[in-house]
Amino acid sequence: MRCPFCGAQDTRVVDSRLSHEGDQVRRRRECGECKERFTTYEAAELNMPRVVKSDGSRQPFREEKLRAGMLRALEKRPVSSDRVEAAITRIEKRLLATGEREVQSRLVGEYVMNELSQLDDVAYVRFASVYRRFEDVNQFREVIDRLESEPDSETAGRQADAFDA
């Protein structure tokens, strides 16, 4: 690796260790010419799969679009940004775990609904109403009835964030 101080090609690794999350390697390097030390980080380059829309068009996966959709559903809801970011990370990991170069937008939507159902019932219903294109109040009622029939412990876990805000 080229030295950022003098541009020499002769650098050596002095120390290597894993980052806290275990997804990066931190390396201390020393230049053979100027003896300066510097740190580099090495991580796997993971390419998110492309998203195939319902009309057949394809577009790159965009984390900011995922975040915007979730935040829109969670607007004015008592869910911490840390929990939202953790949900986004879980969705991205699940998409990568498919091992596919392309995924249907339907799969992304299902992953989002799954995460929102764990975060906040109101946000889940908001997202589901748009995602599944609810056309009448009965469709809302079906989803709400299903949520109400879940054991209280699941609902309590999802709503625990309300008191953390």
Curated annotation (Swiss-Prot):
Q: Does the keyword Transcription apply?
A: yes
Q: What does the record give as cofactor?
A: Zn(2+)
Record's superkingdom? Bacteria
Alphabetical keyword list: ATP-binding, DNA-binding, Metal-binding, Nucleotide-binding, Repressor, Transcription, Transcription regulation, Zinc, Zinc-finger
**An MF annotation (GO) of this entry:** ATP binding
Domain ATP-cone, first and last residues per copy? 49-139
Q: What does this protein do?
A: Negatively regulates transcription of bacterial ribonucleotide reductase nrd genes and operons by binding to NrdR-boxes.
Protein name (record) = Transcriptional repressor NrdR
Q: Which organism is it from?
A: Methylococcus capsulatus (strain ATCC 33009 / NCIMB 11132 / Bath)
Q: Supply the source organism's classification.
A: Bacteria, Pseudomonadati, Pseudomonadota, Gammaproteobacteria, Methylococcales
Gene it is expressed from: nrdR
